[in-house]
Amino acid sequence: MTPPMNKLTSKLGYTFKETELLNLALTHRSANGKHNERLEFLGDSILSFVIADELYRRFPKVNEGDMSRMRATLVRGNTLAELGREFDLGDYLKLGPGELKSGGFRRDSILADAVEAIIGAIYLDSDLETARRIVLEWYQCRLEEIKPGASQKDPKTRLQEFLQGRRKPLPVYTVTNIKGEAHNQEFTVACEVAGMDTPVIGKGTSRRKAEQAAAETALEQLTHG
């Protein structure tokens, strides 16, 4: 494996025996030849099962409707794209010239599809139990945060919808500082929003939590002045 790919597998928490499976999972159909859509089909089904099974175990008294809503939140495209950005997947995607020019490596749908394809690739490279363990590791924070009956839209989603409803550009999140040791880090994120003079700062124990904190603050400022 090349060093960059080693960096990716470290973020994924899984080292492939068949590296070609990972390469295939990262190959978009625009690149011509073999691509990741069959792996995506497989990974989509595995992800849905793993999350449904985990919700069933975690919430023994919750009804089917609430569990369905929670699962939909966890497996929807923008959640998967968020995961893809946490893995910096855009740096590894194999895209055709047209998609490269149009910024396909940043597109939610392409990132989400690649995450599902990687799940399918992990399953084929190992077994269902290993794929389940890896998926649950990726989703640990999200599973701890999600609650039945509550609004399933997180601050980043609500901020995105608020801006889209006003035909404004999407916010841009940038990590400006990381402090502390590997298992006790504090992330600082700047959130730039069109129409706001200065970036909004958020802090958290992970990049995602810092982004959510920044989005929450930005929403408060936009809605309450």
Swiss-Prot record:
One of its GO terms (molecular function) is rRNA binding. Its main location: cytoplasm. Residues 5-127 form the RNase III domain. Gene3D superfamilies: 3.30.160.20, Ribonuclease III domain. One of its GO terms (biological process) is rRNA processing. It is found in: Cytoplasm. Its EC number is 3.1.26.3. Digests double-stranded RNA. Involved in the processing of primary rRNA transcript to yield the immediate precursors to the large and small rRNAs (23S and 16S). Processes some mRNAs, and tRNAs when they are encoded in the rRNA operon. Processes pre-crRNA and tracrRNA of type II CRISPR loci if present in the organism. Belongs to the ribonuclease III family. PANTHER family: RIBONUCLEASE 3, RIBONUCLEASE III. This is Ribonuclease 3. The lineage of its organism: Bacteria, Pseudomonadati, Pseudomonadota, Gammaproteobacteria, Vibrionales. The gene is rnc.
